[in-house]
């Protein structure tokens, strides 16, 4: 696990013990950090097969899924926190995904590169 400063910055925004959905979770590093340091639980969503395998290797719950399909597989308010970090710019329907983020999570944290 790297000691990346951005992991801790995001972790400080996530309440301890939260149920987290990490959209476009990559290799699962952030979710693994939240589990280890904030007592969180939850799922990552990732499309890339190599990253899904890396999540599994980290013992991160991951669903291989195309986010352009939306989040219909989750009920309203299923998660305390939904993370969408550097993901939005890769999606075709950004407005819909922001609506879905608000629907399934009580708190949404969204970032994108400048």
Name each model-derived stretch.
Residues 34-37, 100, 114:
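Glycosyltransferases and closely related glycan-assembly transferases
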Residues 1-78:
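Conserved N-terminal segment of class I S-adenosyl-L-methionine
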Residues 83:
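A conserved beta-strand element that flanks and buttresses the S-adenosyl-L-methionine
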Residues 105-113:
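Conserved beta-strand signature within the Rossmann-like core of class I S-adenosyl-L-methionine
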Residues 91-104:
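A short, conserved alpha-helix within the catalytic core of class I
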Residues 87:
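Hydrophobic adenine-recognition pocket in adenosine-nucleotide-binding enzymes
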């Amino acid at each position: 696990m790297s000691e990346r400063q951005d992991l801790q910055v995001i972790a400080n925004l996530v309440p301890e013990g939260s149920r987290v959905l990490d959209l476009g979770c990559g290799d699962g590093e952030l979710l693994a950090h939240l589990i280890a340091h904030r007592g969180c639980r939850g799922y990552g969503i990732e499309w890339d097969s190599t990253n899904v395998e890396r999540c599994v290797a980290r013992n991160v719950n991951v669903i291989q899924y195309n986010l352009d399909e939306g989040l219909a597989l989750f009920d309203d308010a299923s998660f305390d926190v939904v993370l969408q970090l550097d993901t939005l710019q890769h999606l075709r329907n950004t407005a819909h995904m922001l609506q879905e983020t608000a629907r399934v999570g009580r708190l949404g944290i969204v970032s994108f590169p400048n």
